A protein has these predicted regions:
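Active-site phosphate/pyrophosphate- and oxyanion-stabilizing loops and adjacent acidic/basic residues
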Residues: 23, 71, 75, 128
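Structural beta-alpha unit
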Residues: 75-108, 112-116
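Small/aliphatic-rich secondary-structure junction motif
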Residues: 2-56, 60, 76, 80-86, ...
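Short secondary-structure boundary segments
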Residues: 37, 111-113, 142-143
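Glycine-rich, Arg-bearing micro-motifs that act as flexible, cationic patches
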Residues: 1-2, 107-133
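Short hydrophobic/charged patches on amphipathic alpha-helices used for structural packing
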Residues: 27, 94-98, 128
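Short, well-ordered secondary-structure micro-motifs
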Residues: 18, 45-49, 95-99, 120-122
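Short, surface-exposed alpha-helical segments at coil->helix boundaries
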Residues: 56, 60-71
Length: 143
């Protein structure tokens, strides 16, 4: 049975409506909700001469910014005070999704990249990587 719904939130203004839809789903199924933003290093961000320290600094800055964007969801009353907000970092998408503590019966929800027309049902590159590496079932909501 469904134990919790986690919403993957990239922190963009156009993705807030996906969070709102997941809030409604969590209420409908009477399960707790969590919102996660993934901060992933990905491939080498800079030439080797720059060093990993610069990449670590940029990743840490992005994670801090993501925490602010998540907090804004509560400030704007998009989500309730009981919703868990989390930033998860990783060197790649597999590592980031493995770093999450998943419950048995959990569902991961994410939105598509809104580009109009039929593109609304297609995932962007980040969404596709999340689906590929997710250890739990994924619900894809049209953006």
């Amino acid at each position: 049975s469904l134990a919790r719904i986690t919403c993957a939130y990239p922190g963009t203004p156009e993705s807030v409506h996906v969070v709102e839809r997941v809030v409604e789903l969590a209420k409908r199924f009477d399960v707790p909700m969590r919102v996660i933003t993934f901060a992933v290093r990905g491939r080498t961000m800079f030439p080797p001469e720059v060093g990993l320290h610069a990449e670590d600094t940029i990743l840490a800055a992005w994670a801090a910014h993501a925490r602010e964007l998540l907090a804004q969801l509560k400030t704007d009353r998009v989500v309730g005070e009981d919703v868990v907000l989390q930033v998860v970092t990783g060197n790649d998408w597999g590592e980031a999704l493995d770093a999450v503590e998943w419950d048995d019966g959990e569902l991961l929800a994410l939105g598509t990249s809104p580009r109009g027309g039929i593109a609304r049902v297609f995932l962007g590159s980040r969404g596709a990587k999340i689906v590929r590496h997710s250890p739990v079932p994924v619900l894809v909501l049209p953006g």
